[in-house]
């Protein structure tokens, strides 16, 4: 396979070295566990967190005479993912044996796909930024392929001082290996790519993307070169299990390689591990080539074939994906591209927002979800699934603002009460006397008192109309934030003789 460089060198992404600029080249191999109740070639459960070796069939344990039987749901999930990646779906693919020895691989080989994967070339559009001007840049990252394969078991070396244990619960679980082209040029791009890929998988419902549970892991291929030169020798960083660690591992590895090259050395092609505690990579083994695994078609499995109707049926049932949803939010709800991007970044956030925005002003709903709800969740270290404020409750606050029952300032107080205590927004406002004062007479009385008590400020405001805001603030303070701000502003300007 020839590798084509499709990116134009960008000085913004160069890494300065002691002897000049360098460019980092990054490719990603993401292992995403297929959301399926059973494994790729057996009926054993895929439930996470079970007792060791509780979910192991005779096929998973490689007992003599046991033959693999393909799980149709896993095939469908792979095709759905390929469609979500705008990729070519191959109607005929072949399962191969990848031969190597490891204690947690009972067969002595892994069933994978080598030359004929189920999904071919595709693409992902990532958004990188903001830059110093607050601008975001869209970058297209190519997908080389997606193939199905079995996961291995898990070796545990910390349970006994003299023995290692093997848990085969994960053995045979279906994985999608999604291989990018070497189109990434910075750690920020790599993090944006992984974030976007995880979002797409979650929207599709083909992988839960829970990296802390091991259901999504990344192998990161890193090399450096002088801008515009040929690709350098790459090193692979295995099994990085968080987006933050992906960024850190790339930063360290690029600097490590640059230091070696600037010192006159050469990069050894090898597999490395990322030590999160030290923030550095370390050598694991020399990098294997494909011929080291002695790939050959699995004689126990026929070629996987399906027709166009099979693909079209899955395509017709696909959910709305992040890019399409973002475009709709901008077009139909009048949201900014930035706000729409934040809201579609996670399916759960988008679903929450749409529930709040239904029948309401989209911009108002977006402001409350992004600034107030997500801000509070971030401060509390909670996810959207853990929010104590439901879409109905947040929508209730927006309704109370719209009908003039409360001001925006009082709405913040209502939100805080809902966050800490729960309840119904309208009942909270009623029981705590938080209704906005709309009686013009009462507001006018407060305005007159503030003006009478501050003659010096009156003269200043008449000379400089922008100072009228000081009077508005004083009236709001005097009324405990309950006065209608628009009514206060109109009365202040009228009393001071300031034209609108």
Curated annotation (Swiss-Prot):
GO terms classed as biological process: glutaminyl-tRNAGln biosynthesis via transamidation; translation
Entry keyword Protein biosynthesis: yes
EC number(s) per entry: 6.3.5.-
SS bonds (residue pairs): none
Catalyzed reactions per annotation: L-glutamyl-tRNA(Gln) + L-glutamine + ATP + H2O = L-glutaminyl-tRNA(Gln) + L-glutamate + ADP + phosphate + H(+); L-aspartyl-tRNA(Asn) + L-glutamine + ATP + H2O = L-asparaginyl-tRNA(Asn) + L-glutamate + ADP + phosphate + 2 H(+)
Keywords carried by this UniProt record: ATP-binding, Ligase, Nucleotide-binding, Protein biosynthesis
One GO molecular-function entry: ATP binding
Presence of the UniProt keyword Nucleotide-binding in the record: yes
NCBIfam families per UniProt: gatB, PRK05477.1-2, PRK05477.1-4, PRK05477.1-5
Function, as annotated: Allows the formation of correctly charged Asn-tRNA(Asn) or Gln-tRNA(Gln) through the transamidation of misacylated Asp-tRNA(Asn) or Glu-tRNA(Gln) in organisms which lack either or both of asparaginyl-tRNA or glutaminyl-tRNA synthetases. The reaction takes place in the presence of glutamine and ATP through an activated phospho-Asp-tRNA(Asn) or phospho-Glu-tRNA(Gln).
Binding partners and assembly: Heterotrimer of A, B and C subunits.
Assigned protein family: Belongs to the GatB/GatE family. GatB subfamily.
Protein name: Aspartyl/glutamyl-tRNA(Asn/Gln) amidotransferase subunit B
Annotated source species: Rhizobium meliloti (strain 1021) (Ensifer meliloti)
Protein encoded by which gene: gatB
């Amino acid at each position: 396979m020839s590798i084509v460089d499709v990116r134009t060198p960008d000085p913004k992404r160069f890494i300065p070295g002691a002897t000049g600029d360098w460019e980092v080249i990054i490719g990603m191999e993401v292992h995403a566990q297929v959301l399926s109740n059973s494994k790729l070639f057996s009926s054993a459960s895929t439930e996470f967190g079970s007792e060791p070796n509780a979910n192991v069939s005779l096929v998973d344990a490689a007992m003599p005479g046991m033959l693999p039987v393909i799980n149709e749901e896993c095939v469908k999930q792979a095709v759905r993912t390929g469609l979500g990646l705008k990729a070519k779906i191959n109607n005929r693919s072949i399962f191969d044996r990848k031969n190597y020895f490891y204690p947690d691989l009972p067969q002595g080989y892994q069933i994978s796909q080598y030359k004929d994967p189920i999904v071919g070339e595709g693409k992902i559009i990532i958004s990188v930024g903001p830059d110093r001007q607050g601008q975001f840049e869209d970058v297209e990252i190519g997908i080389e392929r997606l193939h199905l394969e079995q996961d291995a078991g898990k070796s545990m070396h910390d349970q006994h001082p003299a023995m290692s244990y093997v848990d085969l619960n994960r053995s045979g679980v279906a994985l999608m290996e999604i291989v990018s082209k070497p189109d990434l040029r910075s750690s920020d791009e790599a993090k944006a790519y992984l974030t976007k890929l995880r979002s797409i998988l979650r929207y599709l419902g083909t992988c839960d993307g829970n990296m802390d549970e091991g259901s999504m892991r990344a192998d990161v291929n890193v090399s450096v070169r002088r801008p515009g030169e040929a690709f350098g020798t790459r090193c692979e960083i295995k099994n990085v299990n968080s987006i933050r660690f992906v960024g850190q591992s790339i930063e360290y590895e690029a600097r490590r390689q640059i230091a070696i090259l600037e010192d006159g050395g050469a990069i050894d092609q090898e597999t490395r591990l990322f030590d999160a505690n030290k923030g550095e990579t370390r050598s694991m083994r020399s990098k294997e080539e494909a011929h080291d695994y002695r790939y050959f078609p699995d004689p126990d499995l026929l070629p996987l074939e399906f027709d166009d109707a099979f693909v079209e049926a899955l395509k017709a049932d696909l959910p709305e994906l992040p890019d399409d949803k973002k475009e709709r939010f901008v077009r139909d709800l009048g949201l900014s591209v930035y706000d729409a991007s934040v809201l579609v970044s996670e399916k759960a956030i988008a679903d929450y927002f749409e529930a709040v925005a239904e029948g309401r002003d989209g911009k108002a709903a977006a402001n409350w979800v992004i600034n107030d709800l997500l801000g509070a969740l971030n401060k509390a270290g909670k996810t959207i699934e853990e929010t104590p404020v439901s879409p109905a409750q947040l929508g209730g606050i927006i309704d109370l603002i719209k009908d003039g029952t409360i001001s925006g300032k009082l709405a913040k107080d209502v939100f805080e009460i809902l966050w800490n205590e729960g309840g119904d927004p309208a009942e909270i406002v009623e029981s705590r006397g938080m209704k906005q004062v709309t009686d013009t007479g009462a507001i006018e009385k407060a305005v007159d008192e503030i003006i009478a008590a501050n003659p010096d400020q009156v003269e200043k405001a008449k000379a400089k109309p922008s100072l009228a805001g000081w009077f508005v603030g004083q009236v709001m303070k005097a009324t405990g934030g309950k006065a209608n701000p628009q009514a206060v502003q109109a009365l202040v300007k009228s009393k001071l003789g300031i034209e609108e």
